[in-house]
From Swiss-Prot:
Keywords: Methyltransferase, S-adenosyl-L-methionine, Transferase. The keyword S-adenosyl-L-methionine applies. CDD domains: AdoMet_MTases. Could be a S-adenosyl-L-methionine-dependent methyltransferase. The lineage of its organism: Bacteria, Bacillati, Bacillota, Bacilli, Bacillales. This is Uncharacterized methyltransferase Sca_1399. Its EC number is 2.1.1.-. It comes from Staphylococcus carnosus (strain TM300). One of its GO terms (molecular function) is S-adenosylmethionine-dependent methyltransferase activity. One of its GO terms (biological process) is methylation. Belongs to the methyltransferase superfamily. YrrT family.
Length: 207
């Protein structure tokens, strides 16, 4: 899978970064714990987490008593989640969901940008097929209202010399709001969007 080498490098630093210790990414993850807590509080019943990473959201879901299954493609991320947080994150990703029984909620946080633009529709379709008829998909991720908004951010953070962040903004497959609306509409689904910080949006998709 693409980005696996990035995951290997990112894994040891991930928790520190999302908790604000890396100045370059601080704005990306403002209110990180609150955003994850909202996902964990909203998701009920049987919950699948895709792109669990080091298990931060998984842990919150379990603490709230949710029946949660979690998957991630990165050996390094899963090792941190399973060995240091006593979780059971299994191998899987957006196109490889190793469970047959449908879920009431599927949640994913800061992972959907690893899906190529031309594959996002199929990824959403795959996830929706793994939901119950009244199930919901929650996607929390960096998204952009327009190309201009994204380029303005890149210019601003280049001026701050946050070059790792701006490289990510130019190389990862971040979703544009209008494109997501088009995908959801073409699939005959419903979409609700709420902005959570300068970068993050929460998309709720239902049948």
């Amino acid at each position: 899978m693409e980005f696996m080498e990035i995951f290997k490098k990112w894994a040891p630093e991930y928790d520190a970064t999302v908790n604000g210790e890396n100045e370059e990414y601080r704005d990306v993850f403002i209110n990180y714990s609150e955003m994850l807590n909202e996902l964990a509080s909203t998701a009920e019943g049987r919950v699948l987490e895709i792109g669990a990473g080091t298990g931060n959201l998984t842990l919150m879901l379990k603490d709230k008593g949710r029946e949660v299954s979690a998957i991630d493609p990165s050996d390094d991320m899963r090792a941190i989640a399973n060995e240091t947080k006593n979780l059971d994150v299994q191998y899987g990703h957006f196109f490889d969901i190793p469970f047959d029984q449908p879920f009431d909620y599927i949640v994913t946080s800061f992972a959907f940008h690893h899906v190529k633009p031309e594959e996002k529709s199929d990824a959403i379709k795959t996830m929706m097929h793994s939901l119950t008829d009244d199930g919901k998909l929650l996607i929390l991720d960096t998204m952009f209202e327009s190309e201009k908004y994204k380029q303005d951010l890149i210019k601003y953070y280049n001026n701050q010399e946050f070059y790792n962040l701006t490289e990510d903004l130019q190389t990862e497959y971040y979703t544009y709001i209008e494109n997501l609306k088009d995908i959801v509409n073409d699939l005959g689904l419903n979409l609700d969007m709420v902005q959570k910080n300068k970068f993050a949006w929460l998309a709720t998709i239902s049948k």
